[in-house]
């Protein structure tokens, strides 16, 4: 299932004449500009440049429908079946290679210099760090991640920036129309994520990126991104229990699925893993003649006083993996000399800059609420993290606890995390701050695992929630739409899952009270019929507060929920 929500559009967008003109600039002029401004860019043969240019012009000519029409077409590819339901023949993995052939991408994908990353948690952050490092060396990068939080174009970054709406439309309709014309009963239209992966391949091929960094969507072995047969290097981020209905109910089985991205003789890196998972990774590496190296977390010393662009102690694990992945790519493809970490007292300057400037929404992100900031003496700050597994929930709780304590002592509402500005209020003491939980998770998750990990880790750091709010997501899983498509309040919404979450939370609170533990106990909880109502309640609480109180709201349990909150508070 996919939560899919897009920033609102007020007008239909078509390919502009400027974009079409760019495609029709004389080839010699474009090539001169290309080499002048991208010196490290790896040149392709002239014939390939001409071929690529013609394909782009053809692509643009076939486009032209509005953004909303593209989203509607994309929505038609979303299946309402469970991910674990393999009854549909359209789910067969080998179909991915048929689609590549239909889109004439077979040769293009062989030429791509791919970094392929799987894992349970941290793979998106690892890919983001890796892309930022390589881009800081002057190479042209393409980054494919999932899910998106606000706009589907977030999944496709070119040189660190979301693909433009114009280019997205051109590439989208080129792929969609061609597949519509060429698919049949035996080779049906690809499902939602597979289409997006194919679209990424098309975008990166046409844009001639030097490095394509691909995050696995689910698992590894049968993921659409695994159509890449000869990546430059592979990475496995931290493993844990997630998607067990698909990947298996043991860490060994899950590790086996993730290791499905290993390719014969292609170097691979992973981070320290539980023993069961590591044994399987090593077995799979041996079977595929892969040199698998375990990378230790990055240390602050190597960063020469700089902070990582993504906050949280767990990001040092992801950054360590990213450094190894980027190093191999720069050595093999960039033909640069990069010393090994054991030889470094500090990282090279461009590595440090890449790690420090990396950004990814919805991961350890701090966003002060601008609406309340200018209207009240109080303060409302959102701490957003899309954690949705027991292990990532603990990491999220640790980050939140450390962040709120540091923010309350320093008087800021968060360091500049992922581009969020701090508050202008003066110093806050712990006595004038209240922590609130805003939570939802998908019904395939087990709240009896997630909520105790979250609550206990926060309590360990002396952070107790004054209140817990449970809400349904605004996003719908069967449609890619705009904000205008989403009702702010649906009286018919089924809240049975939210009441289940509340019951689990209340039982945790009650057991704590019965145990008469020291410290302040967590307070009451409430279920809201919609997320906008919950946000309004939070803002009203700040407005009605008789004292200057900072309300620190942890939003977690689902990246879809995080995306919905970001969209609402930035309206």
Curated annotation (Swiss-Prot):
Keywords: ATP-binding, Chloroplast, Ligase, Magnesium, Metal-binding, Nucleotide-binding, One-carbon metabolism, Plastid
InterPro entries: Folylpolyglutamate_synth, Folylpolyglutamate_synth_CS, Folylpolyglutamate_synth_euk, Mur-like_cat_sf, Mur_ligase_C_dom_sf
GO molecular function: ATP binding; metal ion binding; tetrahydrofolylpolyglutamate synthase activity
Recorded metabolic or biological pathway in which this protein acts: Cofactor biosynthesis; tetrahydrofolylpolyglutamate biosynthesis
Covalent S-S links between cysteines: none
Reaction equation(s) it catalyzes: (6S)-5,6,7,8-tetrahydrofolyl-(gamma-L-Glu)(n) + L-glutamate + ATP = (6S)-5,6,7,8-tetrahydrofolyl-(gamma-L-Glu)(n+1) + ADP + phosphate + H(+)
Name by which UniProt lists this protein: Folylpolyglutamate synthase
Location(s) in or outside the cell: Plastid, Chloroplast
GO terms, biological process: lignin biosynthetic process; one-carbon metabolic process; quiescent center organization; root development; root hair elongation; root meristem growth; tetrahydrofolylpolyglutamate biosynthetic process
Amino-acid positions noted as binding ATP in the UniProt annotation, renumbered to this chain: 122-125, 363, 385
Role this protein plays: Catalyzes conversion of folates to polyglutamate derivatives allowing concentration of folate compounds in the cell and the intracellular retention of these cofactors, which are important substrates for most of the folate-dependent enzymes that are involved in one-carbon transfer reactions involved in purine, pyrimidine and amino acid synthesis. Essential for organellar and whole-plant folate homeostasis. Required for postembryonic root development.
Phenotype upon loss of function: Has short primary roots. Root hairs are also short and wavy. Epidermal cells of wild-type roots are two times longer than epidermal cells of the mutant roots. Short primary roots of the mutant are impaired in F-actin organization due to extensive bundling. Reduced primary root growth of mutants indicate defects in both cell division and cell expansion. Total folate content does not significantly change between the wild-type and mutant in either shoots or roots.
Tissue: Expressed in both shoots and roots, but expression in roots is higher compared with shoots. Distinct expression in the quiescent center (QC) region of the root tip. Also expressed in vascular tissues of the cotyledons and hypocotyls, and the first true leaves of 7 days old seedlings.
Binding annotation for Mg(2+) 1: 146, 215
Enzyme Commission number(s) from the entry: 6.3.2.17
Similarity section: Belongs to the folylpolyglutamate synthase family.
Record's cofactor remark: A monovalent cation.
Cellular component, GO, one term: chloroplast
Species in which this protein is naturally found: Arabidopsis thaliana
Cofactor: a monovalent cation
